[in-house]
């Protein structure tokens, strides 16, 4: 989805089809804030912010692009003090975030760079070695 598509999706979620409630700048900033959240996942740390209407989210599989619009809708509702709606959309985003994170770790979701190569976190977590009972 392009940035323009994502903004349209946010406007649909927030029932702001005329663009009178939330500025395009705020919506775009919240979409980029969602991208910042996705950067917490090691394999997605190189996702770039969207600045032009034709920009597309790279690295993240296309079926998950809409989750940035879900996050943005949550922030818009929060800004408008519609806390129930804000929490509902944030819960949906966090569920999707966990699904993506787990899918990447389990290997069911593959992340590809611009060259078509799979991105994997090869760093092994720290552990304790048992040297007494071997």
Residue ranges of predicted features:
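Short, hydrophobic/amphipathic alpha-helical patches that form generic packing surfaces
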Residues: 66-78
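Short secondary-structure subsegments characteristic of cysteine-rich extracellular domains
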Residues: 90-100
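Short conserved catalytic/interaction loops centered on acidic-Pro-aromatic/His motifs
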Residues: 81-91
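Short acidic, glycine/proline-enriched loop segments that cap or flank alpha-helices
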Residues: 56-63, 81
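Hydrophobic alpha-helical segments
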Residues: 31, 69-70, 83
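Secondary-structure capping and boundary motifs in well-ordered enzyme cores
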Residues: 2, 60-69
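Conserved short "hinge" loops at termini or chain/domain junctions
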Residues: 1-59, 87, 101-134
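Extended, low-complexity, turn-rich repeat/linker tracts enriched in Gly/Pro/Ser/Thr and Asp/Glu
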Residues: 17-18, 78-80
């Amino acid at each position: 989805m392009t940035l323009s598509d994502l903004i349209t999706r946010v406007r649909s979620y927030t029932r702001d089809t005329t663009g009178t409630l939330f500025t395009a700048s705020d919506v775009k900033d919240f979409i980029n804030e969602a991208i910042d959240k996705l950067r917490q996942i090691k394999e997605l740390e190189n996702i770039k912010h969207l600045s032009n209407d034709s920009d597309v989210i790279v690295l993240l599989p296309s079926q998950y692009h809409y989750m940035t619009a879900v996050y943005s809708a949550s922030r818009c509702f929060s800004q408008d003090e519609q806390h129930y709606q804000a929490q509902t959309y944030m819960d949906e985003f966090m569920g999707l975030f966990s699904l993506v994170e787990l899918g990447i770790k389990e290997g069911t979701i593959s992340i590809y760079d611009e060259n078509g190569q799979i991105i994997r976190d090869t760093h092994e977590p720290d552990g304790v070695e048992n040297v007494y009972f071997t």
